[in-house]
């Protein structure tokens, strides 16, 4: 097993350490997505299941073992080498369904990170007026992005900007599909925190030679659309 690093509850480490490692939830999310996508629906014959294990990566003993390993690291609040996550992302990037798997991984990470927020706080985010809940939600997005994505979040007007100084998925799949992981994470996280999400745009991409990757989410757009619909 590769070395792991323990962190505090807020995931606070020096920036150099943060960029050299990732929270174990990140590689776990990639593997859980592979397993989920590769698992067929319904009850199957035992012989067919054995055959699938040989053909589908997500059902292999290797993936099962690695999921157990990363799950234990998550339980222990540990980080692992970023190169491991990059290797997993590249492996997924060779699949024809790479974008779908990466989006599923992003949603998984967002949900698991959201569940680390205390139930009372999650409840307050749902019932408090937006002028109170939005700043609280933004603080949670910042904390989650820093800990689980090695990312930086800031607000500009009605937009939330997520910057990833070193993406683990950039260039892993054709057509920039690798970046779908972070887009899906941000979209799902905002949906869970504030109930609605407007458009999420990939405004800057490392793969296009534009420096670090950046996404812009209009987290008030969907809310305004819902208000107009109710008024009509």
Q: Where do the language-model regions lie?
A:
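Short secondary-structure junctions
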Residues: 142-149, 190-198
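Beta-rich nucleic-acid/ligand-interaction surfaces
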Residues: 199-219
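Short, surface-exposed acidic
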Residues: 61, 197-200
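N-terminal accessory segment detector
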Residues: 1-159, 168-177, 206-210, 223-232
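General N-terminal targeting signals
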Residues: 119, 179-181, 215-217
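Short, non-transmembrane amphipathic alpha-helical segments
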Residues: 178-193
């Amino acid at each position: 097993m590769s070395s792991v690093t323990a962190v505090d509850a807020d995931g606070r480490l020096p920036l150099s350490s943060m960029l050299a490692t990732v929270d174990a939830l990140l590689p776990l999310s990639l593997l859980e997505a592979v397993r989920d996508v590769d698992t067929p629906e319904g009850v199957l014959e035992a012989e067919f299941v054995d055959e699938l294990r040989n053909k589908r990566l997500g059902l292999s003993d290797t993936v099962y073992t690695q999921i157990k390993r990363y799950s234990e690291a998550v339980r222990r609040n540990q980080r692992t080498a970023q190169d491991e996550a990059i290797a997993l992302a590249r492996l997924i990037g060779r699949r024809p369904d790479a974008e779908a798997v990466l989006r599923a991984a992003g949603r998984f990470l967002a949900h698991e990170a959201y569940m680390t927020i205390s139930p009372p706080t999650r409840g307050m985010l749902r019932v408090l007026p937006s002028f109170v809940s939005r700043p609280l939600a933004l603080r949670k997005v910042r904390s989650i992005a820093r800990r689980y994505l090695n990312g930086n979040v800031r607000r500009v007007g009605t937009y939330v900007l997520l910057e990833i100084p070193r993406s683990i998925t950039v260039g892993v799949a054709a057509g920039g599909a690798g970046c779908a992981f972070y887009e899906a994470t941000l979209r799902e996280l905002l949906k869970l925190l504030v109930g609605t999400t407007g458009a999420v745009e990939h405004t800057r991409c490392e793969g296009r030679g534009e420096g670090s990757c950046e996404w812009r989410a209009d987290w008030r757009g969907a809310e305004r659309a819902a208000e107009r619909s109710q008024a009509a």
